[in-house]
A protein has these predicted regions:
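Extracellular/periplasmic juxtamembrane helices and adjacent flexible linkers that interface
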Residues: 268-321
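Ligand-binding pocket segment of bilobal, Venus flytrap-like solute-binding proteins
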Residues: 171-240
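C-terminal motif of bacterial Sec signal peptides marking the signal peptidase cleavage site
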Residues: 24-27
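Periplasmic-binding protein-like
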Residues: 116-130, 228-268
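N-terminal segment of the mature folded domain
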Residues: 33-151
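Ligand-binding cleft/hinge of the Venus flytrap
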Residues: 63-68, 148-191
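A bilobed periplasmic-binding-protein/Venus flytrap-type ligand-binding module shared by bacterial periplasmic
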Residues: 129-137, 266-275
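N-terminal secretory signal peptides that target proteins for export/translocation
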Residues: 1-11
C-alpha cells in the first residue's frame, strides 16, 4: 500500500470514528431529554377521583368541559371520600380529587418530602347535607339536638337514619364531626346503603326513614330526574340558630351561601400536577366563570365568584304538615 493510500485510509478511519462519536453523543442527549407530557391544558386524558356525593354536578362540569375541548377526556371515578384521598396519596395515575376538605399541614409536608412539590388545593363551592324524609311523612322539622340524639341512639322513635355507607364517606364524617361533635353514632339506628341514589330510593320506599344526602342529588328544581324524585321524598327543615325571620330553614341556595342552613360544607379540589396539563385546564374551567355558573345553576354556592344576593319580599310561610 502506498503512502497516499495509507493516508487516505487514516483519514477515512478518523472520519468514521468522529461520526460514530457524534452519533453516540447525539443519542445520549436525546435520551436525557425529559419526555413531553401526554396532555395539555385542553387535550389528553386524565383520571380523577370524586366524592360520590358530588356526582351530579361534577358530571355536568365534565360534560360541558369536554364539549368545549373535544381533545380532552376526563375519566371520573366516583367513590367514598376516604378512597379518593387514598388515590391522591398512593396512585400516581390520579391527577386530581374532588372532596370535602383540603390538605392538612402534615399532608402537605408528606407530598413535599415525597414528590418535591405540594399539590394545590382550595374550595370551589359550598355544598350542604340535606335531611330528606318520605313524601308521606309528617315529620319534617329537625333541630340539631334532635339529630344528635337520634344518631347517638338516645332518642328512640322507631325511625332509621340512612347513610351512603357506615364508614369512609364524607356524609358519615360530617355527621360525626359536625352533628355528633366527634362521638360515634349508634349503629343500631342507622342503616348503610351503597350510594346517594340508594339513600333516595330507600327513603322513597320507607315512610319511617330519614336520609342524609348531598344537596347536589336533590336540590336542583331544574333537573327533571331530581324533580321526579321530589314527588317521592321531601327536604326537611333544619333549625337555624341565628335566623330572626324563621327558626327553621331548608337548604336552598340562599341559605347555603349565607350559611343560615347549618349543615353546610365545602367542595374542594386537590390537584397533583406541577405543569400546565389537563388537570390545570380542568381546574381553570371549574374556578372561573363557566364552571362557577354551573355550580350556581346546580344550586350550590359558588366560592370563586361573587354573586349578588338581593333582599326581596315574598309571601311564604312554613307549611304545616
Amino acid at each position: 500500500m502506498s503512502t497516499d493510500q495509507r493516508k487516505g485510509w487514516a483519514i477515512l478511519k478518523t472520519t468514521l470514528i468522529i461520526f460514530w462519536i457524534a452519533l453516540i453523543i447525539s443519542g445520549c442527549k436525546q435520551g436525557s431529554q425529559p419526555a413531553k407530557p401526554a396532555d395539555t391544558l385542553t387535550g389528553g386524558t386524565i383520571n380523577i377521583s370524586v366524592d360520590e356525593s358530588f356526582k351530579p354536578v361534577i358530571d355536568e362540569q365534565i360534560k360541558v368541559f369536554e364539549s368545549s375541548f373535544p381533545q380532552a377526556k376526563i375519566i371520573a371515578h366516583y367513590k367514598p371520600e376516604a378512597d379518593c384521598l387514598k388515590d391522591i396519596f398512593k396512585d400516581s395515575a390520579t391527577r386530581m380529587v374532588i372532596v370535602t376538605r383540603g390538605l392538612s399541614g402534615k399532608e402537605e409536608k408528606f407530598f413535599k418530602d415525597s414528590i418535591n412539590f405540594t399539590p394545590r388545593w382550595d374550595e370551589l363551592a359550598t355544598d350542604a347535607i340535606c335531611v330528606i324524609v318520605n313524601s308521606q311523612s309528617k315529620d319534617t322539622i329537625f333541630t340539631l339536638e334532635r339529630l344528635q340524639k337520634q344518631l347517638s341512639g338516645s332518642m328512640e322513635n322507631g325511625q332509621q337514619i340512612i347513610f351512603d355507607g357506615l364508614s369512609a364517606t364524607s356524609t358519615v364524617r360530617f355527621a360525626i364531626d359536625s352533628i355528633l361533635k366527634g362521638k360515634r353514632f349508634d349503629t343500631s339506628v342507622v342503616r348503610a346503603v351503597t350510594s346517594s341514589q340508594a339513600v333516595l330510593s330507600y327513603v322513597a320506599a320507607n315512610e319511617n326513614a330519614i336520609g342524609l344526602v348531598g344537596i347536589s342529588w336533590i336540590g336542583n328544581p331544574e333537573d327533571t330526574v331530581q324533580t321526579k324524585m321530589l314527588k317521592k321524598v321531601k327536604m326537611a327543615y333544619v333549625e337555624c340558630s341565628h335566623c330572626t325571620d324563621s327558626p327553621y330553614v331548608k337548604p336552598n341556595q340562599l341559605n347555603i351561601m349565607t350559611r343560615r342552613y347549618p349543615l353546610v360544607r365545602g367542595l374542594f379540589y386537590i390537584l397533583k400536577e406541577n405543569y400546565a396539563g389537563l388537570g390545570s385546564g380542568f381546574l381553570n374551567f371549574l374556578q372561573y366563570e363557566r364552571g362557577q355558573l354551573i355550580f350556581r345553576r346546580a344550586y350550590l354556592g359558588p366560592s370563586k365568584m361573587g354573586f349578588a344576593i338581593r333582599n326581596v319580599m315574598i309571601n311564604q310561610k312554613l307549611k304545616k304538615e
